[in-house]
Regions:
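N-terminal lobe of the biotin/lipoate ligase/transferase fold
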Residues: 1-129, 181, 185-189
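Short, acidic Gly/Pro/Ser/Thr-rich loop/turn segments
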Residues: 30-31, 39, 142, 157-159
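Residues immediately flanking
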Residues: 26-27, 34, 139, 152-154
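Short, conserved beta-strand/beta-arch hydrophobic-aromatic motifs that form part
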Residues: 41-44, 132-152
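Gly/Ser/Thr-rich helix-start
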Residues: 34, 62-63, 69-71, 137, ...
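C-terminal accessory segment of soluble enzyme catalytic cores
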Residues: 120, 138, 149-208
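A broad "ordered helical/assembly scaffold" signature
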Residues: 99, 127-130, 147, 171, ...
Length: 208
């Protein structure tokens, strides 16, 4: 998948392809972003391997995160130069807004927190903030080639092997957990359709 994204980014940079949104699901894997700290990996590589979890260092921004079945991962391949070279932080904020809109249609109220990247489930409770989506962007030239991970039906316990995004004060959650007994049928398909629709509407991205 990394090679596929890299090819897509090169094609977009060369003008041979349009802006694209890749939507997919990864097998169990822990990825280390450019800001990842060793102490945020709570299990040694051998222990991860014994549980069938791969470990990779990647070129996106951010710290450490987990990907696995039940999580919708989106890679936005976007030529920011063709869009007037907007601030990358502004691009991140737009992704957060798109995810909040899609989550609202799924029945999950969501919000963003000043100074933090990602999307959180609301209302805020007496416990720790509940993070439902993580975002990490990588750039090649002015082309983005990383994106977001939305926990749809993924068991949040999967994150126990890391300090997610380096935030010890955060608890991970999922759409399924937030909905409880209100979980609709075909939740994963519905989430994918809504995210694709909102990205297409807000970014004019063609899902792939």
């Amino acid at each position: 998948m990394t090679r596929s994204r890299s090819r897509s980014a090169r094609s977009r940079s060369g003008g041979a392809a349009p802006d694209t949104l890749l939507l997919l699901e990864h097998p169990p894997v822990v990825t280390l972003g450019r800001s990842a700290r060793p102490e945020h990996l709570l299990a040694p590589p051998a222990a991860l391997a014994a549980r069938g979890i791969e470990l990779h260092r990647v070129a996106r921004g951010g710290d450490v995160t987990y990907h696995g079945p039940g999580q919708l991962v989106g890679y936005a391949i976007v030529d920011l130069a063709a869009r007037g070279r907007p601030d990358v932080t502004a691009f991140l904020r737009r992704i957060e807004a798109v995810l909040c809109a899609a989550l609202a249609e799924l029945g999950v109220a969501a919000y963003t927190r000043p100074g933090w990247t990602g999307v959180f489930a609301s209302p805020a409770s007496a416990g720790p903030p509940r993070k439902i989506a993580s975002i990490g962007i990588g750039l090649r030239g002015w082309v983005t080639w990383h994106g977001f991970a939305l926990n749809v039906s993924l068991d949040p316990a999967a994150f126990d092997v890391i300090v997610p995004c380096g935030l010890r004060e955060v608890a991970m959650t999922s759409v399924e957990r937030e909905l409880g007994h209100a979980r609709p049928p075909a939740l994963e398909l519905r989430a994918r359709e809504l995210v694709a629709r909102h990205f297409e509407r807000d970014f004019a991205l063609a899902p792939s």
